[in-house]
Amino acid sequence: RAAMKVLEAAGHRVYAPRGLCCGRTFLSAGMVDKARKEARKMVQALAPFAGKPVVGLEPSCLFSLRDEFPAMGVGELSGALLFEEFLARNPGKLEFRQMKQDVLLHGHCHQKAFDAMPAVEKVLGMVMG
């Protein structure tokens, strides 16, 4: 909900479908058919929004949309972005109150593996000044 509030404050309209799963947990457990079924459901549910960005919070799930879906043959969601990737590219009307303090950043392993940390650093820089 907090991420939705930030996106709305930036001037973006947000649609958050419920009950969708990327299938990543099934894929990790070797249940490819179940993963493919969940992925197809997600692609079908998001089809009316083709061309719009799909913004996600969880790196493992989000990278499944970008990388695993095409490999499973269920479609492609190439416009899928992590929340911080989207904000780094589309800050919209957001005005950050500058904070002057030290922060320790520990990135998600998938963010590191897929070189997604620069977006986190950029958004933190918008806040930290």
Language model regions located:
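Iron-sulfur cluster-binding electron-transfer modules in prokaryotic oxidoreductases
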Residues: 1-129
